[in-house]
């Protein structure tokens, strides 16, 4: 990817990086392990973003 990115693309990539986190431990504890995963997790090799 280019070193010089448009700001809008950079912000989109940053938002996607922030969303790509595991479910917090306190949520897992609070829901008694019913919620362990979330469907928006993305593997950088398998699923690409629309840019």
Curated annotation (Swiss-Prot):
Keywords: Ribonucleoprotein, Ribosomal protein
GO biological process: translation
Gene3D superfamilies membership: Ribosomal protein L39e
Keyword Ribonucleoprotein in annotation: yes
Gene Ontology CC entries for this record: ribonucleoprotein complex; ribosome
HAMAP family assigned: Ribosomal_eL39
UniProt similarity note: Belongs to the eukaryotic ribosomal protein eL39 family.
UniProt protein name: Large ribosomal subunit protein eL39
Species this chain originates from: Thermococcus onnurineus (strain NA1)
Phylogenetic placement of the source organism: Archaea, Methanobacteriati, Methanobacteriota, Thermococci, Thermococcales
Gene name, Swiss-Prot/TrEMBL: rpl39e
């Amino acid at each position: 990817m280019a070193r010089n990115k448009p700001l809008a693309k950079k912000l989109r990539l940053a938002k996607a990086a922030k969303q790509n986190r595991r479910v917090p431990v306190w949520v897992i504890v609070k829901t008694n392990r019913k919620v362990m995963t979330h469907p928006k997790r993305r593997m950088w090799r398998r699923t690409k973003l629309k840019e």
